[in-house]
Amino acid sequence: WLVPAYSAATAPVGALFALMTKVGVYTILRLWTLLFSSEAGASALFGSLWLIGGGMVTMAFGAVGMLGSQRLTHLAGFAAILSSGTLLAAAGFGQNLLTAGLLYYLPSSTLAVSALFLTADLIDRWRNDGASYAPFERSDNAPFLNAELVPTEGLNLDEDEEVLIGRVIPAAAALLGLAFIVCTLVITGLPPLSGFVGKFAMLSALLNPLGLTASAGTQPGAPGWTLFVLMIATGLLALIALSRAGIRHFWSTHVGVAPQLRVLEGLPIAALLALCITLTLLAGPV
């Protein structure tokens, strides 16, 4: 229900819903670590296997959902599910270093998903031109491919046969493209932004539960290795899904006017992504 509900709402409401989703995740983390910490005696780490298992299933569901989605708002909704599953699975281990990494990753992923909701609304409005069909429903998205999806020989990819060098890119289109790229980097955990820093901290904590300076014999168990592989695999699937969407919306044939972007529409996106960059610059050892 989450993805259809978030996608049906307006872009600002969808962005706020993404924020509220992570508030729920933080509530679970806060209460669970308070009531069932490793020092809670007989109830220590109660339900940890449920958190780890449920989080991993949520990660897989979110990644597969992103791979099967073509609308940007659906991609953003499944990205919220994917990041929430990552946080829940990491929280279930009850490790200090892993918790530190997820606490850094939590605001970063939240800001990026919220920015993606806002960016998706502007991109859809530009690409659809007010029509009732979505960009992926057009049959001429790739006129340079034949029926076998192979590039046609001798075809000039510029339909107007103009020189490709020196063509002007509208400022609004460039800003939308840049915002989409930054969201993609943070959500998928690619360097050099905060998504990579948070995921790297969690992966490092999984491989070295007691820290990099700990002695040998502290290798992760089966749940740790499973989460390690899932984090890398789901990041790859998310990258494929978002890259495919970016190619469809920014590189496909589009006949229409340049996007119109008002300052008040771009400021929230810029502020959210600026916070992600700030998190990157202020990252440090725990």
Regions found by a protein language model. Name each.
Residues 42-58, 105-110:
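Structural signature of hydrophobic alpha-helical transmembrane segments
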Residues 30-38, 182-204, 274-286:
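Alpha-helical transmembrane segments and their membrane-interface junctions
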Residues 58-59, 112-121, 224-251, 255:
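Hydrophobic alpha-helical segments of multi-pass membrane transport proteins
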Residues 9-19, 162-168, 211-233, 257-261:
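Membrane-interface alpha-helices at helix entry/exit sites of multi-pass transporters
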